[in-house]
């Protein structure tokens, strides 16, 4: 019997929202899949752009859901932001917090002083997601940023998956300050590589697999870090958006969910421009991908991705082909 996909890796660096849970609820099957990693001898780390909670709070939530999680296994964008600002500012520098108490805590841990008003003369602004942020908070940040202060965003995710649907993420709030000031922040979290390198180092991993639901953060960040990436279909991105992905956001593997880690990934072969995966096949010509297989068969989408990405290897923007489906 062929080896499972996970057998080629010594660790999983997993995203949270859209991979492990959506809103307050675990994604079906996700907890069991995470629990199984230990029996397979694979280490587990969580890499998240959620800056509204501390790593300890994130780990506690994961344990409530039944997932295996210790505090040190969680690496957040708020931690990355704290480390970045500490490397750029003198100890004791004042930093305006446009975000959560958890973000303020991370800033304090690195020897900086969190403040809440432009009147306190901060030399930097750090902006992270907090569902309670309002106009006054964004105005305070804008005053300080416009005055020339260093501006750091924990992440620029434009959306965040919730139980009721897709909601605006931190990137939308960052964009409001950018529109008001004409400035651009430095970004500490995904899709930048250091967050992934830090997580892999903590796990002493040489062969990590990055698993995420978002091309623009998880997959792009994992690719930038030089790690193997897998996209799951339990969150934001879909089969269609993954097929259309720009080159640097294309995953190495396409999975339905975390349970697919434990099955053999089908081999994809190139037969003179026709790409075969399982019983499905696909070829690309003149912006059209012709797929032989069923639309609900993931192997058909894997073949379609292989064909399209081979035909358009250097896509700087997302570009979707026209799909033509044929039955066997």
Which residues make up each language-model segment?
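Glycine-rich loop-to-alpha-helix module at the N-terminal edge of alpha/beta enzyme cores
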Residues: 47
């Amino acid at each position: 019997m062929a080896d499972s996909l996970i057998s080629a890796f010594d660790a999983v660096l997993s995203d949270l929202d859209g991979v492990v849970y959506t809103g307050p609820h675990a994604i079906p099957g996700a907890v069991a899949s995470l629990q199984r990693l230990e029996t397979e001898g694979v280490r587990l780390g969580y890499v998240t752009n959620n800056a509204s909670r501390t790593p300890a709070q994130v780990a506690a939530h994961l344990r409530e859901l039944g997932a295996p999680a210790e505090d040190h296994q969680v690496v957040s964008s708020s931690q990355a932001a704290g480390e970045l600002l500490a490397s750029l500012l003198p100890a004791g520098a004042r930093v305006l917090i446009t975000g959560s108490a958890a973000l303020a805590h991370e800033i304090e841990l690195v020897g900086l002083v969190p403040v809440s008003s432009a009147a306190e003369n901060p030399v930097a602004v750090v902006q992270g997601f907090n569902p309670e942020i309002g106009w006054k908070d964004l105005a305070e940040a804008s005053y300080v940023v416009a005055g020339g202060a260093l501006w750091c965003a924990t992440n620029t995710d434009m959306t965040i998956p919730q139980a009721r649907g897709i909601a605006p993420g931190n990137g939308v709030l960052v964009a409001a300050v950018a529109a008001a000031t004409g400035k651009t922040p430095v970004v500490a979290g995904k899709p930048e590589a250091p967050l992934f390198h830090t997580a892999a180092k903590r796990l002493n991993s040489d062969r990590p697999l990055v698993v995420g639901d978002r091309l623009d953060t998880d997959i792009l960040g994992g690719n930038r870090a030089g790690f193997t990436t897998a996209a799951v279909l339990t969150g934001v991105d879909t089969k269609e958006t993954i097929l259309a992905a720009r080159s640097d956001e294309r995953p190495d593997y396409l999975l339905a969910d975390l349970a697919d880690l434990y099955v053999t990934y089908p081999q994809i072969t190139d037969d003179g421009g026709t790409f075969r995966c399982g019983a499905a096949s696909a070829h690309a010509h003149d912006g059209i991908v012709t797929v032989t297989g069923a639309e609900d068969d993931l192997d058909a989408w894997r073949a379609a991705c292989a064909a399209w990405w081979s035909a358009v290897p250097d896509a700087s923007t997302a570009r979707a082909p026209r799909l033509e489906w044929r039955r066997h």
